[in-house]
Regions:
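Predominantly transmembrane beta-strands of Gram-negative outer membrane beta-barrel pores used
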Residues: 95, 123-127, 131, 143-149, ...
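Short acidic/polar hinge/loop motifs at secondary-structure boundaries
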Residues: 73, 101-129
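Flexible loop and strand-edge segments within Gram-negative outer membrane beta-barrel domains
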Residues: 194-198, 204, 208-214, 224-257
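N-terminal periplasmic accessory domains that precede
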Residues: 61-64, 82-85, 111-117, 126, ...
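Transmembrane beta-barrel outer-membrane domains
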Residues: 25, 77, 137, 165-169, ...
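N-terminal periplasmic "start-of-domain" segments of outer-membrane beta-barrel proteins
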Residues: 24-56, 83, 124
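Extracytoplasmic beta-strand/coil segments of soluble accessory domains associated
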Residues: 62-102
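Structural signature of outer-membrane beta-barrel domains
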Residues: 37, 91, 103, 149, ...
Length: 257
């Protein structure tokens, strides 16, 4: 009886205890950079659009690339859905890289170029060819890189641009740049809107339900510790409200938010 009782007490006192480790686990750092653009583009055809070229064109990224690159765009009208095509490939085979990060939609694998304002970036690079598959998403057509570059020198600049056009089309952009040898910061705010109610030639009708408006806020900050070490922070916010135009035969009043 005593042996059975002793064995029972031993069994109930034995248990497994799991708990956290008493030491700190050091995780490996993760680097997000666009070094592939520099390291793997020597044999690729690249076109770089500087800030001076960007400022001379319209605000939408579609308009900028249409007149300054070989990219063909399938667009449903001003401010409507716009998708690119490199050398006959589809929009899903074109990667859009924002400061080294692929921003193609996870749902349809493409980017609507009328939801991006070109003046929020100070460097845009168009890279053609199948070598762009290093960015994923089967980008055998090419890649479009939207970059915000840093300038670590004494600088304080303000830029304000206002545009007015037909059919109640308005565009505004303000950019602030502040930098010294250690610190660099850029911030920009853009707003675009239009009633888009143009007349159909040969018909006594106007384009209905084609209005749109969007606002974007972009900022990036960099700090240089020494000649070999820097830290960068990027942020981009976008808010848009867009309707879809109908056709002459059957006008539509549908709306896309």
């Amino acid at each position: 009886m005593f042996k059975k009782l002793a064995l029972f007490l031993v069994l109930i006192n034995c248990s497994l205890i799991w708990a956290q480790q008493d030491s700190i686990i050091h995780l490996r750092e993760v680097e997000l950079s666009d070094t592939q653009l520099k390291n793997f583009s020597r044999a690729q055809n690249t076109t770089k659009l500087s800030d001076s070229v960007i400022q001379k064109n319209q605000a939408s990224l579609t308009s900028l690339l249409r007149y300054n690159s070989v990219v063909y765009f399938k667009e449903n009208g001003n401010g409507m859905v716009s998708s690119p095509s490199f050398r006959g490939t589809t929009a899903q085979q074109t990667a859009v890289i924002w400061n080294g990060i692929n921003i193609n939609s996870q749902l349809n694998g493409q980017t609507d170029f009328n939801t991006l304002t070109s003046r929020d970036f100070n460097s845009i690079v168009v890279r053609s060819g199948g070598g762009s598959v290093i960015y994923g998403s089967g980008a055998i057509g090419g890649t479009i890189h939207l970059n915000n570059e840093f300038s670590f020198k004494d600088k304080f600049e303000n830029h304000l641009r206002l545009d007015f056009g037909s059919f109640s089309t308005y565009s505004a952009n303000y950019t602030l740049t502040l930098a010294n040898e250690k610190f660099s910061a850029d911030a920009s705010v853009s707003h675009n809107q239009s009633e888009n109610d143009y007349e159909y030639l040969g018909y006594n009708k106007r384009n209905e339900n084609g209005q749109y408006q969007n606002t974007s806020f972009n900022w990036h900050i960099g700090y240089r510790f020494n000649s070999n070490n820097e830290v960068h922070i990027f942020s981009h916010l976008f808010d848009g409200d867009r309707h879809f135009s109908g056709t002459i035969a059957s006008p539509s009043r549908s709306k896309y938010l």
